[in-house]
Amino acid sequence: MGRQVNEREIVLAVLMEITENGAYSHKILGEVLSKYQYLEKKERAFITRVTEGTLEHLIEIDYILDQFSKVKVKKMKPVIRNILRSGVYQLKYMDSVPDHAVCSEAVKLAVRKGFSGLKGYVNGVLRSVARGLDTLDYPQEGIEALSIQYSIPTWILRLWEKSYGEEVTRTMAADFLKERPVTIR
């Protein structure tokens, strides 16, 4: 009998395909949801929310990780980096998932992926994030601050600022993270 499918493992696989192999998020997520259509609606919604949310807030999440980890995001092993990214997303944006569950599941996932030697690191970073998230200082001014706040690359923000000015750029950036209306076809 096969091992039960774990939603966080699926999220990790999708994030790895996108961040390490350059897959298009909408395509790979669609394929994965089609492959696992037998999962309950709640599980599929979790996979979608964590994957899309992690990607939408990637720059901010990487900033947060860099504040709480001695190893910078760019130097982390790709699997560990993406486990931590999805964990930070859950800690910051999903109140329905308890902090201890996020940490515990991330550690289990690291072990399942062959990184049992880094389980203490994963646990330590995520527990530090959970404790310190509310007191974290973000940059307040400049393009870097906008980039982190809205998770938009600085090069795009610079182009917008050059073309549209600072105020329009700020408005456009804020609109990217607004909740999108539901569309039914």
Model-derived regions: residue spans:
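Class I Rossmann-like S-adenosyl-L-methionine
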Residues: 1-185
